[in-house]
């Protein structure tokens, strides 16, 4: 169906979010309900619908607005019941946080169809002495550790099987002067990849 607008915000070491606006139809109303999962065609990161708002615009057309969070937010529904004290790589510590709270936490606490990736590349994050806060929110613990090591975390979704995988990865340097040989990613009106821009200067 026709989409009025889609804002799909990916984040590197934290949870992304989306906002979708579509014309009101019976099919859209049936599919776009809270807790349903949405994924872009050809994509591998999904999001859960958490907010629905139906409006009538200035032309008299009804529209459905839905918003939600990427599936990394599922980890935020769990806490660390046992403190993690380890000397290991940040990558393995991130796996341990999710394993303890989401995939090897017992039948009552495991998140269905969620597993930990076994094919992630070694990020070379190096060993650290790590001590988690007891009863910390699992998502907050993972995001804090990932940010400290400059690692990306995400939940990948296989749309065909309905399986979800927690993954840790290292970002690529796409700046104009990068030394890794990566093609730079440049946003410019000259390249017609900036539609709108806005500047705000505030003391509040």
For the regions a protein language model found, what residue spans apply to each?
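Generic N-terminal leader segments that precede the first folded domain
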Residues: 1-13, 79-81, 99, 109-116, ...
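An acidic/polar, Gly/Ser/Thr-rich interaction patch typically located in mid-to-C-terminal regions
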Residues: 2-30, 151-152, 187-204
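A generic short-segment signal for beta-strand/edge and adjacent turn/coil regions
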Residues: 5-10, 14-19, 32-39, 122-123, ...
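Intrinsically disordered, low-complexity, compositionally biased regions/tails
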Residues: 20, 110, 128-130
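Surface-exposed cap/loop segments at beta↔alpha junctions
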Residues: 25-122
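Short beta-strand-centered interaction patches in the first periplasmic/extracellular domains
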Residues: 44, 51-75, 114-203
């Amino acid at each position: 169906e026709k989409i009025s607008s889609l804002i799909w915000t990916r984040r590197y070491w934290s949870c992304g979010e989306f906002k979708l606006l579509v014309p009101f139809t019976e099919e859209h109303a049936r599919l776009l309900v809270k807790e349903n999962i949405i994924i872009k065609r050809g994509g591998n990161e999904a999001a859960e619908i958490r907010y629905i708002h139906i409006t009538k615009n200035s032309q008299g057309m009804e529209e459905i607005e839905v918003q939600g969070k990427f599936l990394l937010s599922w980890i935020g529904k769990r806490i660390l019941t046992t403190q993690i004290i380890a000397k290991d790589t940040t990558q393995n510590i991130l796996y341990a946080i999710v394993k303890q709270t989401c995939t090897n936490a017992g039948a009552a606490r495991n998140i269905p169809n969620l597993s930990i990736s076994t094919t992630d590349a070694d990020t070379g994050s190096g060993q650290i002495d790590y001590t988690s806060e007891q009863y910390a929110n699992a998502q907050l613990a993972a995001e804090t550790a990932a940010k400290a090591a400059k690692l990306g975390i995400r939940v990948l979704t296989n749309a065909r099987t309905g399986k979800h995988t927690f993954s840790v990865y290292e970002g690529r340097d796409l700046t104009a002067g990068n030394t890794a040989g990566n093609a730079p990613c440049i946003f410019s009106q000259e390249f017609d990849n900036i539609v709108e821009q806005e500047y705000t200067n505030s003391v509040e």
